[in-house]
Amino acid sequence: MPQTIAEKIISNHSGRRVKAGEFVIADVDLTAVQDGTGPLTVEELKKAGFTKLANPARTILFIDHAAPSPRKELSNSQVVLRNFAKETGAILSEIGEGVCHQLLAEKYVNPGEILIGADSHTCTGGALGAFATGMGSTDVAVGMALGKTWLKAPQTFKIEVEGAFKKGVGAKDLILHLIGVIGADGATYKALEFHGSTIRNMEMADRFTLANMAVEAGAKAGLFFTDEKTRAYLAERGRGDNFKLISADEGADYEKVIKIDASSLEPTVSCPHTVDNTKTVGELKDIKVNQVFIGTCTNGRIEDLRIAAEILKDKKVNPGTRTFITPASRDVMLAALKEGLIEIFVKAGASVQTPGCGPCVGVHGGILGDGEVCLATQNRNFQGRMGNTKGFIYLSSPAVAAYSALKGYISDPREILK
């Protein structure tokens, strides 16, 4: 029987042919936690009596959410991870290295693998043809200790995207539009499998954006076939030998097929307080923006920063719109320095922050004041997400965010991108 990508990868890790809906115990290739979820994982491991990890070299502890830490309680949680790494041989990713999902892609995830992480956006790794999914701290603790996990093979939605984007429109607009169509819980425990000419022509940075936000429709995973672009991405990072072809079988069974014409899309924004509350930029009038944030595991890659720099070059951000730019990793920061992007941002009046999650999680780096509006390239706009339940968060592409920083209100970047 033909299989989806999810069914294939899970079958290869469970010793038998698996179809959607079946429960399996599957081998895990890679596990990850971050400084918000990791301390609980460590606590659960110790409570269960585990003293060794199944694969320390493939167990990664990231300090990225409160990096640098703004208060002692968070600093103490980070000490827990540092000590655990010393005790077990797990890999520690320190403050300034970057966001866990970006670093997993840059350094660790390979096609055909199963990655479980104690963070919702672990699904980012699906862009590399891996079954990457977020789980709770306790589930990840078991995976770290035993090298196995228990899960149900998900049904799959096939997302077919054809056509070319208009100028000023891209992957972020596509995924926001898709979530608006599906709904915030419309794909709960499904895999989203991306297909079509638009996806084939898409660079890896944009595939990561799509995979990253699959969970915002409730999805278990966001999955991609592998191709020469995947191979090149891995080879550039010293993992070319780990490339393998991953694809769904012809005739695989999909619960639903959703077709999108990329050429019909407009710059799209998610409005407070849910990601599926989407509107085109043209539908939003006179929405003043107090803060713009460009970065995160969704849109903090070098390609995203290039877009922002193109718009901000030789200009000044609106004096009433503070602007934060946070590279997703140290490698992205170094590339941005080499290309002169950081100078462009600083001269434009933006603040460039330490690689990491930045203001996204609302513990430091840009907490909103009462009634303030932030336009961010992150993946969530839940009430209180950026540290204040009285704040308002809109989500957009880097192009919309950068141009809005200049104008002081949510604006269409096509006015400047000719």
UniProtKB/Swiss-Prot annotation:
Q: What is its EC number?
A: 4.2.1.33
State the superkingdom: Bacteria
The annotation note on the cofactor reads:
Binds 1 [4Fe-4S] cluster per subunit.
CDD domains per record: IPMI (cd01583)
Known catalysed reaction(s)? (2R,3S)-3-isopropylmalate = (2S)-2-isopropylmalate
What does this protein need as cofactor?
Answer: [4Fe-4S] cluster
Keyword list (alphabetical) reads: 4Fe-4S, Amino-acid biosynthesis, Branched-chain amino acid biosynthesis, Iron, Iron-sulfur, Leucine biosynthesis, Lyase, Metal-binding
Keyword Glycoprotein on entry: no
Q: Single Gene Ontology BP term?
A: L-leucine biosynthetic process
For molecular function, the Gene Ontology terms on record are: 3-isopropylmalate dehydratase activity; 4 iron, 4 sulfur cluster binding; metal ion binding
User: Where does this protein act, in terms of pathway?
Assistant: Amino-acid biosynthesis; L-leucine biosynthesis; L-leucine from 3-methyl-2-oxobutanoate: step 2/4
Residues that hold [4Fe-4S] cluster according to the record: 297, 357, 360
- InterPro entries from the entry? Acnase/IPM_dHydase_lsu_aba_1/3, Acoase/IPM_deHydtase_lsu_aba, Aconitase_4Fe-4S_BS, Aconitase_4Fe-4S_dom, HAcnase/IPMdehydase_lsu_prok, Homoacnase/IPMdehydase_lsu, IPM_dehydratase_rel_enz, IPMI_cat
Q: Which NCBIfam families match?
A: hacA_fam (TIGR01343), IPMI_arch (TIGR02086), PRK00402.1 (NF001614)
Q: What does this gene product do?
A: Catalyzes the isomerization between 2-isopropylmalate and 3-isopropylmalate, via the formation of 2-isopropylmaleate.
Q: How does it assemble?
A: Heterodimer of LeuC and LeuD.
PANTHER family, sorted: HOMOACONITASE, MITOCHONDRIAL (PTHR43822:SF2), HOMOACONITASE, MITOCHONDRIAL-RELATED (PTHR43822)
Similarity-based family: Belongs to the aconitase/IPM isomerase family. LeuC type 2 subfamily.
Protein name, please? Answer: 3-isopropylmalate dehydratase large subunit
Task: Tell me what organism the protein belongs to.
Answer: Elusimicrobium minutum (strain Pei191)
Q: Which gene encodes it?
A: leuC
